[in-house]
Amino acid sequence: MAHKKGLGSTRNGRDSQAKRLGVKRYEGQVVRAGNILVRQRGTRFKPGKNVGMGRDFTLFALVDGVVEFQDRGRLGRYVHVRPLA
């Protein structure tokens, strides 16, 4: 006779890959045009001066310069790139 009952399989045991979202370049860092500044879902950060936004809401530098963050309260948080003089 069997010593164990037949066991059903569990419906757990899956997880999705981490998406590596977040801020990639911080305030005061020097960046080149095209550098990714923030990877995000939706507009947690909005593009400011000299910053572009991709279809997936990725923010990137349009010019060489220094990264700046600005919190405008209910208007949202903005990322700017101040051009190198």
Curated annotation (Swiss-Prot):
Keyword Ribonucleoprotein found: yes
Gene Ontology MF term list: structural constituent of ribosome
The keyword Transmembrane helix is assigned to this record: no
Biological process annotations from GO: translation
Pfam families named among the record's database cross-references: Ribosomal_L27
Keywords tagged on the record: Ribonucleoprotein, Ribosomal protein
Annotated region (Disordered), positions in chain: 1-21
GO-annotated cellular components: cytosolic large ribosomal subunit
Function per UniProt: Found on the solvent side of the large subunit.
NCBIfam families: L27
Oligomer and partners: Part of the 50S ribosomal subunit.
Family: Belongs to the bacterial ribosomal protein bL27 family.
Name the record gives this protein: Large ribosomal subunit protein bL27
Species whose genome carries this gene: Thermus thermophilus (strain ATCC 27634 / DSM 579 / HB8)
